[in-house]
């Protein structure tokens, strides 16, 4: 059946290509159709031709050279340097003879691409190698280098994975698509361990696979993967909406226990979730609480990950097409639009989203081709969950920092490495640069620095204002001199014993990491301030402190339990959240186009989810459901 489809596609391609094009072979690689040719320049010079063929066959098409026409790598390197302007600042060139691609890493990748792709086409024409152009981040990133190295070293294995996947995807559906159902396997009427299982007569897809970092035990920390209808053997695809551990943290487990299929996400999500998963493993090891997977399973997931840009339509199963749209939550966060069958049903899973532009990101997308079912988060769905404006939140932060510095104190801001940390860095950089906040050192601890490096490698995912600032004004706030990377415990002691300063450190809920160590050092001094800017889950130390706990039993540096008396100033500043508040959630339902027929709510405490569902139904007369974990809902 697959061979019949491939032969049909080949015939269409051959009929449409000019006769002088020498096609060596056509094959499936994952969701793409790859054409290997002995004279690729003829095709690449006519971009509209391939675009039109792709539209006709409804598949993504990649053009590569046949191995027989590839230039010797050493000669190709010299030729590439002749073609590409020196201003591009090429940092590395490597060759993948499995895919016949040349990987070019540069500080200014746009100059390697050239106007309308002109420079890239020259590289193909003169060397035969198909250029794959990557940005060299201004901040060196160990994670990005490890991922790129893994993909280079395992290119042959990855091609085999993609070919097998291509054969799986490009089959004709066996059954009519007359039903679709969703099973809540985590993150429903709760926050954490998000996991949603989509079943159709032909396919099985998992949307997110997270952990609850504040769960306490295995029963409450991990998704319900033991439901009878779920098996790894039957799973066609996994979609990860964004990198936070409550959405991606349990993904390596699937590979540990036999899953060998694809993961779909944006490129920033792949990079960031790899960072967070490796850190999760490291912390668990240090705390002698091993996880049910290890580093090699993270590596395996990287090899199976297929990255997609926003708006890129991709076949992920014989009867399902996926398109990712901006969610505005963190870098690379996405809403997943799933087109089931020949349009019999369309659903959107929002993941976590922010329906407001921030300094860091654009507002979440709200226009889709079709929607029958919307699965939407409800983190701040309670009627009282109205957050102040960003401007007001920033003023409140400045006020708190100013008063603390006047007392000679230090400001500890526990943050997630990804999202709020970068938002705050942009705010602090501007206010210190313009003199609104006194120039004091801002210490960056934990994974935040590495996460910053990933942000600098993916500027196309940042807000337009920030992109303009970086590219047109030459000002990148992430590499400002006010920020200092913390290296090791000795430096942390110097910071807490030193002059007034601002400390940004993980974890965001004080559930571990270096922020907890800073808290223990600083909490008994009333001159210091602890500022919460993000969500504090029920059961976390952060939530207990918010509730007013003044005596906190924790292990000290000698691993002995002692009670810490909290005397520092505690401040919670709403408005920096990467989640939509109550007004934004209601506005999103009002503005989304087209209107869904039904809405399922997830990712919210029990009463907030129910409160939001009731309000949506009363206001918009749209059917709403609030499934519990383990419940299944038929959506078609």
From Swiss-Prot:
Which cofactor(s) are needed, names only?
Zn(2+)
What organism is recorded for this protein?
Methanothermobacter thermautotrophicus (strain ATCC 29096 / DSM 1053 / JCM 10044 / NBRC 100330 / Delta H)
Query: Which BP terms in the Gene Ontology apply to this protein?
Result: DNA-templated transcription termination
Q: Where is this region: KHa?
A: 3-70
Biological role: Terminates transcription on the whole genome. Termination is linked to FttA-mediated RNA cleavage and does not require NTP hydrolysis. Cleaves endonucleolytically at the RNA exit channel of RNA polymerase (RNAP); the 5'-3' exonuclease activity of this protein degrades the nascent RNA released from RNAP.
What does the record say about activity regulation?
Most active at 0.5 M or 0.7 M NaCl, less active at 1.0 M NaCl. Nuclease activity is inhibited by N,N,Tetrakis-(2-pyridylmethyl)-ethylene diamine (TPEN), a specific chelator of zinc ions.
Query: Which family is annotated?
Result: Belongs to the metallo-beta-lactamase superfamily. RNA-metabolizing metallo-beta-lactamase-like family. FttA subfamily.
Superkingdom of origin organism = Archaea
Q: Which Pfam families match?
A: Beta-Casp (PF10996), KH_TffA (PF17214), Lactamase_B_6 (PF16661), RMMBL (PF07521)
Q: Where is this region: Metallo-beta-lactamase N-terminus?
A: 179-383
Carries keyword Transcription regulation? yes
For Zn(2+) 1, which residues are the binding ones?
242, 244, 329, 352
Q: How does activity depend on temperature?
A: Optimum temperature is 22-37 degrees Celsius, less active at 55 degrees Celsius.
Record comment regarding domains: The KHb domain binds ssRNA better than the KHa domain.
Q: What is this protein called?
A: Transcription termination factor FttA
Entry's SMART domains?
A: Beta-Casp (SM01027), KH (SM00322), Lactamase_B (SM00849)
User: Could you say which EC number(s) this protein's record lists?
Assistant: 3.1.-.-
Tell me the HAMAP family matching this sequence.
FttA
Which GO molecular function entries does the Swiss-Prot or TrEMBL record give?
DNA binding; exonuclease activity; identical protein binding; RNA binding; RNA endonuclease activity; RNA nuclease activity; zinc ion binding
Write down the NCBIfam families for this protein, in alphabetical order: arCOG00543
């Amino acid at each position: 059946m697959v061979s019949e489809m491939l032969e049909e596609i080949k015939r269409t391609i051959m009929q449409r290509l000019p006769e002088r094009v020498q096609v060596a072979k056509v094959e499936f690689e994952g969701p793409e159709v790859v054409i290997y040719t002995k004279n690729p320049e003829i095709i690449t010079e006519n971009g509209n031709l391939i675009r039109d063929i792709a539209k006709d066959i409804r598949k993504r098409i990649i053009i590569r050279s046949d191995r027989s026409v590839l230039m010797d790598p050493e000669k190709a390197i010299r030729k590439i340097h002749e073609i590409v302007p020196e201003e591009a600042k090429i940092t590395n060139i490597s060759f993948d003879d499995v895919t016949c691609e040349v990987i070019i890493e540069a500080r200014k990748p746009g100059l390697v691409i050239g106007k309308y792709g002109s420079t890239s086409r020259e590289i193909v024409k003169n060397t035969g190698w198909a250029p794959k152009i990557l940005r060299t981040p201004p901040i060196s990133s160990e994670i990005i280098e490890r991922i790129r190295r893994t993909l280079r070293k395992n290119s042959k294995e990855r091609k085999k994975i993609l070919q097998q996947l291509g054969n799986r995807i490009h089959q004709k559906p066996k059954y009519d698509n007359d039903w679709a159902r969703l099973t809540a396997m985590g993150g429903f009427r709760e926050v954490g361990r998000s996991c949603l299982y989509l079943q159709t007569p032909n396919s099985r897809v998992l949307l997110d696979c997270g952990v609850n970092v504040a769960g306490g035990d295995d029963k409450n920390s991990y998704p319900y993967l033991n439901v009878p209808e779920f098996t790894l053997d039957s799973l066609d695809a996994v979609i990860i909406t964004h990198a936070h551990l409550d959405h991606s943290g349990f993904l390596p487990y699937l590979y540990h226990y036999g899953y060998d299929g694809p993961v779909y996400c944006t490129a920033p999500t792949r990079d960031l979730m790899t960072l967070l998963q490796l850190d999760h493993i490291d912390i668990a090891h240090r705390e002698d609480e091993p996880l049910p997977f290890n580093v090699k399973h993270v590596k395996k997931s990287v090899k199976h990950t297929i990255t997609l840009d926003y708006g890129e339509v991709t076949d992920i199963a014989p009867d399902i097409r996926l398109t990712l749209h901006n969610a505005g939550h963190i870098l690379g966060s996405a809403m997943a639009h799933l087109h089931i069958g020949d349009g019999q049903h369309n659903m959107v899973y929002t993941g976590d989203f922010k329906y407001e532009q921030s300094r860091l990101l654009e507002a979440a997308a709200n226009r889709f081709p079709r929607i029958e079912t919307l699965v939407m988060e409800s983190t701040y769905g309670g009627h009282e969950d109205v957050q102040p404006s960003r401007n007001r939140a920033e003023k409140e932060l400045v006020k708190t920092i100013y008063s603390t510095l006047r007392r000679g104190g230090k400001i500890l801001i526990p943050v997630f490495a990804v999202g709020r940390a970068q938002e705050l860095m942009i705010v602090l950089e501007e206010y210190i640069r313009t003199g609104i906040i006194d120039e004091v050192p801002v210490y960056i601890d934990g994974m935040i620095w590495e996460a910053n490096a990933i942000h600098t490698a993916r500027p196309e995912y940042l807000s337009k204002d920030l992109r303009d600032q970086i590219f047109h004004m030459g000002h990148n706030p992430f590499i400002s001199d006010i920020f200092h990377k913390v290296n090791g415990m000795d430096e942390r002691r110097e910071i807490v014993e030193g002059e007034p300063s601002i400390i940004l450190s993980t974890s965001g809920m004080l559930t571990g990491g270096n922020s907890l160590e800073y808290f223990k050092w600083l909490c008994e001094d009333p001159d210091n301030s602890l500022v919460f800017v993000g969500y504090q889950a029920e059961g976390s130390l952060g939530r207990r402190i918010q509730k007013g706990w003044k005596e906190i039993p924790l292990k000290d540096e000698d691993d002995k339990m002692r009670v810490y008396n909290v005397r520092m100033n505690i401040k919670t500043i709403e408005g920096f959240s990467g989640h939509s508040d109550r007004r934004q959630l209601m506005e999103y339902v009002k503005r989304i186009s087209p209107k869904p027929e039904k809405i399922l709510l997830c990712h919210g405490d029990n009463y907030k989810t129910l409160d939001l569902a009731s309000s949506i139904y009363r206001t918009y007369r749209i059917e709403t459901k609030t499934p519990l974990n383990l419940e299944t809902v038929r959506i078609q």
